[in-house]
Amino acid sequence: MKRSKLLSLLLVGALSASLVACGSASGSTSGDTANSASTETTDSASSETTDSTGGENSKKPLVWFNRQPSNSSTGELDMTALNFNENTYYVGFDANQGAELQGQMVLDYIKANAATIDRNGDGVIGYILAIGDIGHNDSIARTRGVRSALGTGVDASGVIDASPVGTNADGSATVVQDATLDIDGKTYTIRELASQEMKNSAGATWDAATAGNAIGTWSASFGDDIDVVVSNNDGMGMSMFNAWAKDNKVPTFGYDANSDAVAAIAEGYGGTISQHADVQAYLTLRVLRNALDGVDVNTGIGTADAAGNVLEEGVDYRYSAEERSY
């Protein structure tokens, strides 16, 4: 019987000097593009690439990495793509775990600094959110993670609505809701003032320039109502930070632990989450190499290879077999 395996890496959020999580200063994998590696080039993380003809390609090893194949509307995993053949694997980070860490990072910062970040003293902590790609499962998870942690999420068919709110100056939007947070005897309202997908005129998503333009528009509309800036990744986050948030001392939170974002924490960037791209790269190549060599997929991962290479399960990575693979 066939089993399609899932390798998900554990995310580790390290405390920075500003009491928020940040990652290492090494390169990052942002989850901004769909990727796969195989002996045949594959361009999209969807079942549309699946060779259902039973031809020669259907027997070749296939390793999805960085972005799990998923439904572009709901973020639901594409089990057809994940079960392409017995040598199909996914290597990447747990999108939901990372999203939860980012949301908790923002919440912890607000709790620790509510009195100082409420810039106009109105008792409303207003945040704006840069969404990378409304059809990308990582982007969906990160949007849900922030809204879940802050209490601004609204249930939509059993999951938190990840739709952009547009603008929400008065808290009347239906895709989000106002939340309340009691801190040191004072009750604050948490409100998502605005959010949008950062797509440029050419159709490119996760676009930093679009985010930089958006923060200009939002700051003109909301002014001192903006207390926190949140982004699905550091590329967009740093664009908004450099364009406006840095000069106005508004904490900005991203994702990926890009080197410039980590360095910017010393200048007021709120925090970021590391995906440990070095481990992801090793696992992607290792799983593919093992499949091509016809050796046990765990070689050099959970069990040492001939050179002694081995990772520690539960620390460096986590392994989980797909429940539908039996």
Question: Residues of each region from the PLM?
Answer:
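Acidic/His-rich segments in extracytoplasmic proteins that coordinate ligands and/or metal ions
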Residues: 34-37, 45, 51-112, 116, ...
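Hydrophobic alpha-helical
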Residues: 37, 51-58, 62, 146, ...
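Hydrophobic alpha-helical segments within soluble ligand-binding/sensing domains
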Residues: 83, 89-122, 141, 208-212, ...
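Short, solvent-exposed amphipathic alpha-helices that sit
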Residues: 98-102, 137-191, 210, 214, ...
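Bacterial signal peptide processing site
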Residues: 23-26
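Hinge/cleft segment of the Venus flytrap/periplasmic-binding protein
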Residues: 124-125, 130-131, 138, 150, ...
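Bacterial N-terminal signal peptides that target proteins for export
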Residues: 1-10
